Amino acid sequence: MTVENVEEKLSINEHLKTDSDFLRGGIEEGLDTAVTGAFSEGDQQLIKFHGFYQQDDRDLRNERKEQKLEPLYSFMLRARVAGGVCTPEQWLGVDEISSTLTSSNSIRLTTRQTFQYHGISKRNLRTLIQSLDKKALDSIAACGDVNRNVMCNPNPVESRLHEQAYYWAKKLSDIYLPRTKAYAEIWLGDDKVATSEGDEVEPIYGKTYLPRKFKMAVAVPPDNDVDVYTNDLGLIAVAQEGELVGFNLVAGGGMGSTHGEVETFPRLADDFGFIKAEDTLKFAEAILKVQRDWGNRSNRKQSRLKYTIVKHGYDAFKAEVEKRAGVTFEPKRDVVIGDRGDRYGWIKGVDNRWHLTLFIEGGRIKDLPGQPLQTGLREIAKIHKGDFRMTSNQNFIVAGVAEEDKEAIEALARNHGLMGKLITETRGRSIACVALPTCALAMAEAERYFPDFLTKVESLQEKHGFADQGIVIRMTGCPNGCARPFAAEIGLVGKAPGRYNLYLGASFEGTRLNKLYRENIQEAEILSELDQLFARYVSEREEGETFGNFTVRSGVVKAVIDAAKDFHD
């Protein structure tokens, strides 16, 4: 069977995209329908391309059903902020929106260096998007079957190199935006334009866009805070004398899978070789187009680039990319892939400016009793002269602070609970997805439960005498993998309320996946397993050996070398 006729029956989503008039669908009519807080089933898929998902409060679902009311629908909107960089003025706008147009009264930092709002009513969607637009922010392509928010190392210590890496992240984000005018027409009030053929409106995507979401990241070694190997396309910066000369390109990563379906699996990206900086767009576009043309449009669970590469083979995929790019890969350059954590506290850059990284538990920016975090960041934004950076670990950097401004910034941070609390190495490296009560896919808690769970793990580390050592722990409410749990030394993936699958064995640096160790277990069982494993680790580990590497070397779990073959075995 040839590539051209592989797909015999298109998925429903493919028909929706084809018939949507370039992502317009019935969204505008749905906005004007006051009898329900929801959109139609088809438009619920299309609104993702505009940056938001329809949700409901699952804590109230049964109560409202008994009252014969429809679910309490609301929307989660995710902004597009390439590399996580925004100005203080923009942040003040982001902050005001959260308190005036959402019911959550909070801002949620994501694992892809942007922010999202929860609890938006349908009637407030247009006003919210227009408010973002006034601050030069938008949500187009933050979700949907397109290139999503592009990540970039946010720790600006090597300022020149970071600036060059950020340039490419921003360029990739801008160039691969959908070209349809639907977003501007529906949300910003632009005049409707007559549409033409797909290639004219969407010269890269066409009228059916990509088969599935596509994620890009730019890493600046030795930092791997962006988890570059978990992306569809990863660019690992290669520098000479502090100047960017090109990238080691990796492709085919992705975290999502489905419980009980062994044909789905997480996967880390393959190394394809070195590319010169000036060839970056040639290769990026070639990979996007190969995925557009070769990707599975019949079964969405098999539609990510990782499955395309597995299906067609590494060599065939590489050859096709080189053919379309008109350039061949060079042998990859030697780089060191290191820590995935953030540098907390003050760090001085080579330009003599200071950068303050603030730990944000669960990425949730909200005023809490004794910790008015949101107010604190608002006050900092009022006086800060540099910029802000959101990290892929759900934290917040006050970047580019002059020496004379440090004291005032730190005073505000401490007075509002943003500094001063001891953060263990493990907690500082651990992340969780939102999960309940808003995510429709969640099978178990994550964000609301994770801090207390971490406290119990920290107690076990203290008990066994290695509390000063960091372990990468991640929790998600389902196997879609938003918090990249399959790349964690300890991964917890929701299976049912209060129950999780326990995965072990990923590398500390994010260069090896973990593997299922125990299935569908509750907290007491999880902690019991970790208690025993920590005891073994302390007594049997080799010098400098990380916990993830120990669990593989000691035979607790097998190493995942080829996810398609051995993740589920």
Swiss-Prot record:
Residues at which siroheme binds: 482
**Residues where [4Fe-4S] cluster binds:** 433, 439, 478, 482
Q: Which InterPro entries is this protein grouped with?
A: CysI (IPR011786), NiRdtase/SiRdtase_haem-b_fer (IPR005117), Nit/Sulf_reduc_fer-like_dom_sf (IPR036136), NO2/SO3_Rdtase_4Fe4S_dom (IPR006067), NO2/SO3_Rdtase_4Fe4S_prot (IPR045169), NO2/SO3_Rdtase_4Fe4S_sf (IPR045854), NO2/SO3_Rdtase_FeS/sirohaem_BS (IPR006066)
On the tree of life, the source organism's domain of life is Bacteria
Q: Does the keyword Oxidoreductase apply?
A: yes
Q: Which GO terms describe its cellular component?
A: sulfite reductase complex (NADPH)
Biological pathway = Sulfur metabolism; hydrogen sulfide biosynthesis; hydrogen sulfide from sulfite (NADPH route): step 1/1
Explain how, and how many, cofactor molecules are bound: Binds 1 siroheme per subunit. Binds 1 [4Fe-4S] cluster per subunit.
Q: Which family does it belong to?
A: Belongs to the nitrite and sulfite reductase 4Fe-4S domain family.
Among PANTHER family, the record links this protein to: SULFITE REDUCTASE [NADPH] SUBUNIT BETA, SULFITE REDUCTASE [NADPH] SUBUNIT BETA-RELATED
Xref: HAMAP family: CysI (MF_01540)
Name of protein:
Sulfite reductase [NADPH] hemoprotein beta-component
